[in-house]
Every structure is written in C-alpha cells, then in structure tokens.
Amino acid sequence: MARSTPIERYRNFGIMAHIDAGKTTTSERILFYTGKSHKIGEVHDGAATMDWMEQEQERGITIQSAATTAFWKGMDKSLPEHRFNIIDTPGHVDFTIEVERSLRVLDGAVFVLCAVGGVQPQSETVWRQANRYKVPRIAFVNKMDRTGANFYKVRDQLKAKLGAVAVPMQLPIGAEEGFKGVVDLLKMKAIHWDEASQGMKFEYGDIPADLQEKAEEARTFMIEAAAEANEELMEKYLGGEELAEAEIINALRTRTLATEIVPMYCGSAFKNKGVQAMLDGVIQLLPSPVDVPDVTGTDVDDENLAMSRKSDDKAPFSSLAFKIITDPFVGALTFFRVYSGTLNGGDTVLNSVKGKKERIGRILQMHSNNREEIKEVLAGDIAAAVGLKDTTTGDTLCSIDQPIILERMTFPEPVISMAVEPKTKSDQEKMGLALGRLAQEDPSFRVKTDEESGQTIISGMGELHLDIIVDRLKREFNVEANVGAPQVAYRETITLADVKSDYKHAKQSGGKGQYGHVVIELSPLTAADRADAKLAPAIKDDFLFVNDITGGVIPKEFIPSIEKGLRETITSGPLAGFPVVDVKVKLVFGSYHDVDSSEMAFKLASSMAFKQGFAKAKPVLLEPIMKVEIVTPEDYQGDVMGDVSRRRGVLQGSDTTGDGSASIINAMIPLGEMFGYATALRSQTQGRATFTMEFDHYEPAPNNIAEAVMKKG
C-alpha cells in the first residue's frame, strides 16, 4: 500500500519534563490542536476506524497509550502535512527506566521547562539521559502566565546548569498576568492567539516598540547561530548579505540535529498560547527517521558482528518492542517502533532475542481519543500489536529470513525485595498471574518464589516502585495483598587474589564409586578482566570461569559440569546466602578416574572447592549504595543533613534551586538506611521536601552491619 505520508515528514518525538513543568497540559494541547486539523480515518486508505472510547467508558478503564499518532500542517496551514508519533515519557525520576525506554525509540524531544522554577534537579537528570542517547531537542518554556515567570532566567540556566547553547526562536510579549503572546524572530512579527477559539486562531502584528531592540539583538544571535552551520553561510553573513528564512531554518536544523544548539520557544499551555508555534518548530527543527543514524544491532549467531538497518520500507523488517501494557480486556498491548521494512497484520515475525516466532494478530494505531485497527505499518511507524505471547520490553521483532538483534536496552538489577502474599488463599493463583503480567510490562521488576520458605518475593528499584506494584495489584487485578518488611539485595565477594583451593570428591567403597578432583584459583574480577576482549564475552552474572587445564588431566567432557557446579554455588553465597559477584575462578589442575569419574562427581567437587576457597579469600558482604537527591526549604537544611549523616550517608555537595527558594542536597546513602525515609523526611520538613533516589553502586558493608545480616541469614 502506498504511503500516505513520506517518511521525511514523520516526527517521532517525546515530551520531556520534570514533574511540575506542565507536561500533561502541554501534551493535551498538542493533541487538541493536532486532532482538530485532521479527520481521523483517512490515515490508511480504507482502514476501519474503531472508536473504543464508549467501551472504555462503560468499563471504567482507560487503555493508557505509550505513543499517540497525530497530524500537523503548521499553525497557518502552510506546511505539508506531517505525521507526529508522540512518545509518552514519565516525569518522575523514580521511573528512570521509563524515560530510558522512551528515549531509546524517539528521534527528537521537546523539553518542557517551567518559566518560574526553571532548570530543576529532575530536569538535569532527564537532560543527562537525553545527552547519553544524543537526542536532538527544542525547549518550550511553559507557564509564562504564572507569577515569577522569567524567560531570560531560564535561557541563562540552560547554559549555566545544563551546558546548552540555547537559541531563542521567540521572545515573550509580557510575562505573568501580562503575558500576551510572542515575537517570532524568524518573521520579526508579533503573534497573538485568539482566546475565544482556545488558540485555534491567531494573528500576526507589529512588535511592541519596547521590545524592538531586544528582538533585534535576539534575531542577530539566532542568525549568528545559524551561520555557524557551515562556512558558506558564515561568509555570506559576514559579507553583510541577508540570509533567507529557509536558509536560517535549514542551518538551525543542521545544528539542532547535531545537538550543538537547543532552539527555545515559550508560551502558556494552560492559556492556549505558544504550543502551536512550538509544533511548527517540531516540523522545522526536529529530525525525521531518515535524519538520524541508521539503527544498529548484531548478528543473531555472532554478537560481535555489527549490523545496521536503514529507515526504508524496502529494507528487511526490524522493530523494537519498547513497552508492554496489560489491559484486562484486550490482553497484552505490545508497543513497537518500526525501524525498517513493512509489516502486515497476520504476518509471522521472529523475536530474535528469544529465538521464537510470533504471529502478529491485530495492529492498532493510537490517536488522541480513539484507537484504529490498521492493516500494515511502515518504516518509522509506531504502533501496538495485540496478543504477542513471548515478547518482553527491549526485544527485537524482525523478518525471519534476515534476522537482526537491535541494540538492547539496559535494565538495572533490582535492589530491594519484599515478600508478598494474598490476603485470601483463593487469590494465590490470581496474584501469580497478575505479578507475571506486571513483570512482563516492567523489566526492572522481578518475581520469584523463595525455595526454602515458599514465599513469593517481589523485587524492584525502590520502596516507591514496589508500593506502586502492590497498589496496581489491588486496582487493576482486584488482589488484596499483605507485604513483608523490605529486604536489601546484598551481594558477596572476595578481596584476596590467587587463592588456591584443592578438593577431591571420592567415594569408592564397593561397586561403582564416585571420583572428581579439582584445583581452582579464586581472584576478584578486575576492570582489566572486563576490558579484555578474550575474557569479557565469558563474563556472565559478574562471574568469570577460566579453564586452564592442560595435558588432559581432566577430560574435556567434565569441564562444563565443573563450571555448572561453580555457577550453581554462586547463586547463594557461603556468607549469608546472597549471590556472589565479581569473582574469577581459574581451573588449574585436577585428576580423574577411568571408571568412577562422572559429571555429578566433578560438579560436587567444584562446588566444595569454591566454598572452601571463598572462605580463605577474605570474603566481604556488599551493600547497595543509593544516589539520593533531596530538595528542601533552606530552613530545614541542617536537620536534613544531620539525618543523612545518621543514615551513614556521605554528602556529595549542595546547591540551590533555580529560583533560590530551596536547597538541593546530594548524598550517597546505603539502601538499608533508606527504609521509611519518605515518612521521616515529610515529618522533618512539614511535608515541604522531596527526594529522589536511584541505585549507584555496591560497596563493602561495615563489620557491624555485615555481622547483623549474617546472623539473620
């Protein structure tokens, strides 16, 4: 089927912001303006449009959308129609995993900032993530109508706090209650939006006299930023020639795509001003799928063989599943981004990560207020597939004939666990199914059964993360659950290198005996080992096994059993039963018996040799250390810092927020000391402080803590 929108006119972008910048209102306004400009149902010729809204209302549920498709022809309808796939990004830093996964599939971003609060701590976290993925972005300074709004202060903070070269494309006309509109620095005209039509209509006017000089200065700065795109433009500009509007836009686009500049827009989403012009900026300055580097991946059979796919309908099909949403009626909705090729409903594809085939049943396109079943998706599209069985977040779905594994998303290991049980025994099975579904949606959440106690253990990224999981059990699956006290995910390791351990497992009293003899050397796993091209591929679960046997003193067929014995032993360490990490084991010698040696005998020998060697290698217990950021009014700073120290925290420094109203305290605090911190901080600061926390690293626990944990274990 022919494309209705050329791929060059696609914009896959996210709205990024910290929690108070007005992201929701901005997103709503985007859907409002774009929804009005296009009659849904004409997207794919003859495709059935199925409005699910009534059914949703009857059921009292909302199928949340991870990506919404909309269309935009420009504020004054002068641009060719562009297709927007707007990817949802959460504002809460406790769910950095969510931000990461949306950044993985978007090509550009609109960064929403509050004109009053400016660049806040959470903005910095999200900005750093976007830098890591080299995401081109434009900034929208929202809430220009609020008391204390200051566009110029935010511009300066973008430079001072985030190191960004901010290039205003507009200046505000007035601020706070007097915010009337913006000056368009490209056209050198004032824009006023009509309030009666909720900003659907607007008119150009003259720039107010008191802004003329400021506008000239800002335009010069913008043109200079454009001229730096290439020598030809710079010569033209320095020679006194006027640059055409198209030249300026193309040059600014080049520099935005290279993440050299951040063009700035402003407005008030709440007052229906500015969002429309910012959407024109999305078209003019953010990338299409063909403007970003080809997606990279590896060969299915050889992870060292790099491959790539062009954003082209004719290329082999490749896509990435980036979010799974469980809906009680439709089942699992798998959102995926198509990087290359095309896919039709009913096709069978390969999940190259799992090595399993999946049949694509229905494909749904999400719009602002309805869902549409579509026949096919093309390169650059984002859609949802219904009913995939084996696909989880981060998996690649691709053509069976020309498979590829796209670059995986990295998901952090959980750092906190708690036991959970249903309040009524009859809910046991229901709870198991519900937890399984939630784990499929969220790769940073894990579920397992404790073999000794039989309890169900859930693990996640923090207390808040698990609280929300328990809340969702109740809200979405009607399972009331009791939870145990949170448990810290400690680890065990060794500190001495080259520790030899010799163990002989021999039972030879009549009949067929058992005989396995191994000599191993234990050492801490080093950064050099991880960087070694030969060793690195063999490191799994932070453990490296090296076979140094020569001359056949142990036959080859027993080596896998020896490794298996070691790997099974490290899942529950000798100190307190926690997983063993960062250990290298070399198999250096041993012996065997022609008749009595068996795989089981060598497995037992390697397990016992490891336990004995581990005890001699100065073992230590490792505890997770969290990076904590606390924002508190200055009056409480002393109390908060004192409490951080009592929790064995190490202060990393402090700062003040953009508007100077609060202190930002950065610290490294052991997770074991952070339970109940939300409540403690609330009572210390009368509910006026907030904090965010993410896992940073493991380090040895002090002796008193280690002893207490080992006693419990």
UniProtKB/Swiss-Prot annotation:
It is found in: Cytoplasm. Gene3D superfamilies: 3.30.230.10, 3.30.70.240, Elongation Factor G (Translational Gtpase), domain 3, P-loop containing nucleotide triphosphate hydrolases, Translation factors. The keyword Endoplasmic reticulum does not apply. Coiled coil: none annotated. GO terms for molecular function: GTP binding; GTPase activity; guanosine tetraphosphate binding; translation elongation factor activity. Pfam families: EFG_C (PF00679), EFG_III (PF14492), EFG_IV (PF03764), GTP_EFTU (PF00009), GTP_EFTU_D2 (PF03144). Residues 8-290 form the tr-type G domain. Keywords: Cytoplasm, Elongation factor, GTP-binding, Nucleotide-binding, Protein biosynthesis. GO terms for biological process: ribosome disassembly. Its main location: cytoplasm. GTP binds at residues 17-24, 88-92, 142-145. One of its GO terms (cellular component) is cytoplasm. The keyword Signal does not apply. Catalyzes the GTP-dependent ribosomal translocation step during translation elongation. During this step, the ribosome changes from the pre-translocational (PRE) to the post-translocational (POST) state as the newly formed A-site-bound peptidyl-tRNA and P-site-bound deacylated tRNA move to the P and E sites, respectively. Catalyzes the coordinated movement of the two tRNA molecules, the mRNA and conformational changes in the ribosome. NCBIfam families: EF-G, PRK12740.1-5, small_GTP. Belongs to the TRAFAC class translation factor GTPase superfamily. Classic translation factor GTPase family. EF-G/EF-2 subfamily. This is Elongation factor G. It comes from Stenotrophomonas maltophilia (strain R551-3). The lineage of its organism: Bacteria, Pseudomonadati, Pseudomonadota, Gammaproteobacteria, Lysobacterales. The gene is fusA.
